[in-house]
Amino acid sequence: MNLRELQLRPFRLTLRTPLQRAGSGHRERNGLLVTLIDDESQVGYGEATPLVEFGTEDLAATTSLLNELAHRLAHHPLPLTGEDVEELLASLPELTDAPAARCGLESALLDLAAQRAGLPLAKFLSASARASIPVSALLSASEPEDLAREALASIREGFRVVKVKVAARILSDDAKRLIAVRRAVGDEVKIRIDANGAWTESEAATALRGLSPLKLELCEQPVPAANHAALRRLRWQVRCPIAADESVSFPGARDLLLDGEDGPVADVVVLKPMVLGGLLPSLRLARRADALGVGYYVTSSLDGVVARLGAAHLAAAVPKADWASGLAVGQLFEKDTGLDPCPPRQGEIQLPVQPGLGLAANWSRT
């Protein structure tokens, strides 16, 4: 089976409400839909949506590289196994520094390979993949009252974990927001927070100690990404579990995060396929973390439905599902890149049973 054509379609996703994070915010996401068509007209889908602040290339580099590969890979034999996909991508060294481009191309290749194998992508990645995954709700409101209403609505929809962005305002204001959420959802619902690396070590320790009565599930990236020593120290200074997010984005840091001479620096690692270069590198990292007793879960990078669907298959294929994945973000966009075949319901995503990603060959923007 050979590749007949690689198509690229640019898209823009506009957020209904700008999502504030410490130091910046997001109003829109721009990316490329990657479509591979083989010589029997079978279609595989991928998505490349760079996130430069997490260490990916920019959109111009993504576009240039994938356009170049569209010509180079024309009529190239298509891989049949995950190992074959890895081998093909390894033969393209220019993808090493372009994780978003690699993710988009890898997804489309895996989609085709899984379809030919007659397996849903999750089962193609792991024979023991689960049929469904738990997901968290990302809350986007700013004011305590609005945040509480949003949290309560999420719980009524069946979510058991909610996530709140913090550190974009003074600690006392964040405390009021989180107290409002806890009062709204009760004690049984888990609350995780994300500081996006905006606190100093001292600020993080003060904040997490002060917030301890709220029994937070975890804190994502409390200190800057490069400060691994502070992440490790915080694990012993506070009761709240510490998750490495941006810190995982840089390839040279992953060995230090998990295999440093003093052991792992965080309790949990966050797996963003768009940042890590695809599903296969993310799956390897999850298995490595699992062997070391480090937790992990999969999140989107505010991606479109194709990337989120691939990430959901990954979340079903990783060894454990102890932590809810952060993939319930489609409702944040005014319009997605197309219909979502498996939107969250009752706090879970049920994976498609069709071979591959689970998108029809004529899937398109609606």
Which residues fall in each region the model found?
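Structural signal for conserved beta-strand scaffold positions within catalytic alpha/beta enzyme cores
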Residues: P10, A137, V270, G326-L327
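Buried hydrophobic packing segments
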Residues: L105, L109-A113, L285, R308-A315
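N-terminal capping/lid subdomain adjacent to the active-site entrance of alpha/beta enzymes
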Residues: M1-I191, N196-A205, R209-P213, Q237, ...
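Catalytic core of soluble alpha/beta enzymes
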Residues: V164, R169-L309, K335-T337, C342-P344
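Intrinsically disordered, low-complexity coil segments
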Residues: H71-E86, P251-A266, K320
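Active-site pocket-lining/capping segments in soluble small-molecule metabolic enzymes
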Residues: T299-P341, R345-Q346, Q354-G356
